Amino acid sequence: MAAKDVKLTKLAECAGCGAKVGAGELAKLLSDIKVRKDPNLLVGFDKADDAAVYKVTDDIALVETIDFFPPIADDPYTYGAIAAANALSDVYAMGGEPKVALNVMAVPEDMPSEVVHEILRGGYDKVYEAGANIVGGHSIYDSEPKYGLAVSGFVNPSKMYTNSGAHAGDVLILTKALGVGVITTAVKANMATAEEVDAAECSMMTLNRYARDIMVNYEVHAVTDVTGFSLMGHLLEMCQGADLAAEINVDGPEFLSPHVFELARLGILPAGMYRNRRYAEKYVEATGIARERVDVLFCPETSGGLLIAVAP
């Protein structure tokens, strides 16, 4: 296999966070797992939050997360950078700052070394942009490439955000445009324009660090990042955590391209959309809204924006 012949997205059945196990299936898998009680464990897996948080001192808590996925871009450097930005995002969603990371990688045994090197270089550069360091990792051979990071960061426990603190009357802010899941699926069908691909990749490579650094200056009550469970799925978790309902203007979110609705109408949708919709649609009232517009809101996003509940 020559490096020039490698089309990373052709080696994967699902792209990016579209490969994520659905929220409903995940809840069943974890339903009988006991949670060990620890007064210093501020956020564990039972909270369905973006990362775990463990209190070390009154002023310092450790933020822990891991995220990896199959290729969502053919260019190896771009893929590595997107995967890293996506993993780092969980720390930002908790209000924290990443400090160290470990590579998690699986590659075919015959993949050219220069391709693997470029994936890693993309990851390293994005982690360095975040002000953190990659300090090691683990790699295995697999027929399908996968890359991501285990990330550790820190947050002051008194300044930590969760996805369950929203207040009645809060305003919702989404910091990135939607449509990545539709566009990356359209790429596989040769139905996405170069401009749409560029817009999607640019969005996915953008760190949520910059949104985090702004939001800490405001009265923020809850935060989550919008990834594989879609805007609707992650908003549902936010609502359930606060025992609230939310109202969305379907024309409110920004979209990477108006073409995503036509693509959705034609059925160019990731498999994860159907998993997300099957799980969450019973909680959603969307009477009179065109099916394709709702479908896009259920589509998995990869390295999506922060969804912030803030006082008006």
Residue ranges and their predicted role:
Residues 1-93, 132, 167-173, 177:
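N-terminal glycine-rich phosphate/pyrophosphate-binding loops that anchor nucleotide-derived ligands
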Residues 57-73, 97-192:
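Glycine-rich anion-binding loops of enzyme active sites
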Residues 76-101, 118-129, 207-221, 226, ...:
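Small-aliphatic-rich amphipathic alpha-helix that forms the alpha element of a beta-alpha
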Residues 32-35, 78-82, 165-167, 187-191, ...:
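Short, solvent-exposed amphipathic alpha-helical segments in soluble enzyme
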Residues 2-14, 25-28, 110-133, 142-145, ...:
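Glycine-/charge-enriched secondary-structure boundary and capping motifs
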Residues 41-43, 51-54, 90-92, 124, ...:
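A generic local secondary-structure boundary/capping motif
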Residues 150-159, 195-215, 289-291:
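Active-site glycine-rich loop that binds ribose-phosphate moieties when present
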